[in-house]
Amino acid sequence: MSEKINSKEDFINQYADKIWDRASLVNPETGRFYDEHIPILSALYHGIDRFIEAQDKYNTYQTALEEVKAGRKKTHWIWYIFPQMRGLGTSEMSKFYGINGRDEATQYINHPVLRDRLVEITEAVYNNDKTVYEIFGNDAIKVRSCMLLFASVCDIPIFKQFNYKYNWD
């Protein structure tokens, strides 16, 4: 029978050897994980639910949708509304909310709430009178990465249509 996991630290310690070589994760002098690995390990612990938690907190998804419909992103939610592959950004947020490969992207798009929300907000951007660049400014590159990712793992038409509209395919 497997050992009960009581905390995030227990989870990380139990699975560290399975995920990577423990020596590359842990500072031998302190016995603690190197700081750069904490967001990734934490994301693995939280799984796909980290997106739901972030989108639901403070009604953030609704705020994001309203901002997109109004034609301008004003607040900070891009990482968990339009996720992209891990490694494309360097911030703690991009590491924590980065998609860890095609399998996790498929899990994301197969989750009924996450799929419906991503399709809804993508359609809101697509149908807006303003361009993706006007709505998102410098964050348009994150939207591009998101659209390319999900167009590659599913057959939902809006992602391919979006990529075609902006010549991203």
Residue ranges and their predicted role:
Residues 107-148:
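Mid-chain, well-packed structural core segment of small domains
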Residues 55-69:
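A long, hydrophobic alpha-helical segment
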Residues 80-83, 142-153:
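Short, hydrophobic/amphipathic alpha-helical patches that form generic packing surfaces
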Residues 5-19, 37-59:
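Extreme N-terminal tail/first-helix region
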Residues 69, 86, 126, 151-155:
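Hydrophobic/aromatic-lined pockets within catalytic cores
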Residues 67-102:
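Hydrophobic/aromatic-rich, well-ordered segments within soluble, folded domains that form packed cores
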Residues 20-35:
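Acidic, low-complexity, intrinsically disordered interaction modules
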Residues 41, 153-169:
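Charged phosphate-binding loop/patch that engages nucleotide di/tri-phosphates or the phosphate backbone
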